[in-house]
Each structure stands twice: as C-alpha cells, then as structure tokens.
C-alpha cells in the first residue's frame, strides 16, 4: 500500500498563500488550510450558525507528499526560502511537523476540509466531487482545489468576488491577474462578463485554472495563459482583478491604468493591513480613485476607478 506524508506548517495568517505556494513548488501533491477565521460569522445552507471557535493569529498549512519524497529536505528548503523573504513579511515563528498516512487516509484528509460554501447571495463554490442541488437563482462554481490554490473561500477571494459583483453589469472584458484556481474568472463569467483573459506566472496554476474552467459548462469565454502580471498585455479591459500579495500588486498599477478603459475598474485583494497605505498611494499616483475599501480580519481589498468624474469616489 502506498503511503503519504503530511507536513504541517503553522504560520501567521498573512503567510498562507506564500507558504502554500512554496510547498507546492517543493513537490506537495496538495495543500489544505486550517484557519479559525473561516468560522467567524459562517452559517450553513440552512442558516444554522457554526459554534464559536477561539480565534488564533496563526493558521495551519497542511501539505501532502508521497513517501518517495524526503520531507526533511523539504523542511530545510522551506526554511531557507522563507528566510529570504523575512524582510518583506513577518511570518512569525514557523512550526513544522510531519505524520505518515496510508493512501486511504490521504484521500479522506484531503477532502474533509472542503464543503460547499455560499460566497455571495448568488454564487456558491462546490468541490468537484460533491453532489449539490442548487436553489432557484443560485449559480454554482465547481472547483477542484487539489493543487493548493484553495477552495475560493479565503477572505481575499470572497472580497474579490464581492467586488466583481459590485462592478459587473454584463458584457465587460475582464483581465484576471494571478488567476490561481481560476475562480475569479469563472465568477466573472457567471456575473455576465463577455470575455475574460486570465494570467498566471506559475505553469501549474495555468493548468489547474484550465481544468477548473472545464468543470464549469459555458466557460468558453475564458482564455488562460502564462504571463508575468500585465507585461506584454495589450488588451483593454473594463475590469482588472488581482488577488495577489501586496508586494506584487505594487508592480501592477501603472500597467493596469494603461489597460483599463475610462470609467473602468481595478480590483485588488490580498493586501495585509500594514501594506494597505502603500498600495493605495501607488494606485492613486497611477491615476486611479478609490471607490470601495473592504476589510476582513487582517486582509484588505479595494475597488479603484479610472474616471474624471470623482464625485462618487472616496475623497472625490
């Protein structure tokens, strides 16, 4: 019987995406997240409130490796990679532990973290292996979160979808920068966007996004490609959305202003509290005006508008 190894990394919440992606780059076959914030204010589909859970500043990233991988080498490589990034982000004191799993345990552990989740009034994210009957008017996003890009329920993703729901009216062109699982592209299509162009620097993300898009019928209007932010892109868009770390977002704003049509929008998420002022200042210096600012826990998201009429924007 094949066995698997479970490697758990305890890290500050803002390090979730960074550590998850590093673990995948170091050979993980899947990653799951345990975050006490996921239970705050949650209700199930019948309206029942989940029990109170003590809130922690740290989350646990669990990575799965086949027994052919030497996880001690993975641990050492992970520590080395993170030490190079400590100037950009305080991840706290890493705690790392490993456990051996049988193959059937791997399958059970992998899927137990993922349940259907109502993200907005109209959109529900459903794991690809789950039978789910939609209610009247409910739109379903099928996702297979099997390669670490999450289930779409992280606060940064939720706020991105809220923002898309705010600005999309139908018929728009959308650029999805750092698409990851492809969830924001799929959401954009369901919310009426005419054409979506999704980019990611990571070849794994490009493949996973394409696979998730194929799980959802009618998504022929989504085009996925490898790309480094918006470098070399010449497609004008009504909306640009980027759910990536703040230290990467700051390299996006000038190209975004070049490509967003007049009266169009730039949505940015994945911004920790300490980086918010920096991101806002750079977006405004590029020419955008802040229209909406959202906060959930440590995370910030925002909607900026490219407009000459500033009467309806913050500070206008």
From Swiss-Prot:
Transmembrane segments: none annotated. PANTHER family: ELECTRON TRANSFER FLAVOPROTEIN BETA SUBUNIT LYSINE METHYLTRANSFERASE (PTHR43648:SF1). One of its GO terms (cellular component) is cytoplasm. It catalyses: L-lysyl-[protein] + 3 S-adenosyl-L-methionine = N(6),N(6),N(6)-trimethyl-L-lysyl-[protein] + 3 S-adenosyl-L-homocysteine + 3 H(+). Methylates ribosomal protein L11. This is Ribosomal protein L11 methyltransferase. Belongs to the methyltransferase superfamily. PrmA family. Its EC number is 2.1.1.-. It is an enzyme of class 2 (transferase). The lineage of its organism: Bacteria, Bacillati, Bacillota, Bacilli, Lactobacillales.
């Amino acid at each position: 019987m094949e066995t698997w190894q479970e490697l758990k990394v305890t890290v500050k919440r803002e390090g979730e995406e960074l550590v998850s992606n590093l673990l995948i780059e170091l050979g993980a076959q899947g990653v799951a997240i345990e975050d006490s914030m996921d239970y705050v204010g949650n209700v199930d589909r019948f309206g029942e409130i989940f029990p109170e859970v003590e809130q922690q500043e740290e989350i646990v990233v669990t990575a799965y490796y086949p027994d052919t991988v030497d996880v001690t080498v993975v641990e050492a490589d992970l520590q080395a990679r993170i030490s190079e990034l400590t100037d950009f982000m305080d991840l706290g004191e890493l705690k790392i532990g490993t456990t051996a799993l049988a193959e059937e345990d791997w399958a059970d552990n992998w899927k137990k973290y993922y349940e259907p989740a109502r993200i907005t009034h109209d959109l529900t994210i459903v794991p690809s292996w789950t039978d789910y009957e939609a209610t009247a008017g409910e739109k379903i996003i099928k996702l297979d979160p099997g390669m670490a890009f999450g289930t779409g329920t992280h606060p940064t993703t939720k706020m991105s979808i809220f923002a898309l729901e705010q600005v999309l009216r139908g018929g728009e062109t959308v650029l999805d920068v750092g698409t990851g699982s492809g969830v924001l592209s799929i959401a954009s299509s369901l919310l009426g966007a005419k054409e979506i162009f999704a980019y990611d620097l990571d070849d794994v993300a490009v493949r996973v996004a394409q696979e998730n898009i194929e799980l959802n019928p009618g998504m022929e209007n989504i085009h996925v490609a490898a790309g480094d932010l918006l470098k070399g892109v010449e497609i004008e868009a009504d909306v640009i959305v980027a759910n990536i770390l703040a230290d990467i977002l700051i390299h996006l704003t000038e190209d975004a202003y070049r490509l967003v049509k007049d009266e169009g929008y730039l949505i940015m998420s994945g911004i920790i509290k300490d980086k918010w002022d920096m991101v806002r200042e750079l977006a405004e210096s590029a020419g955008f005006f802040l229209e909406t600012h959202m906060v959930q826990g440590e995370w910030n998201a925002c909607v900026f508008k490219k407009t000459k009429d500033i009467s309806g924007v913050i500070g206008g």
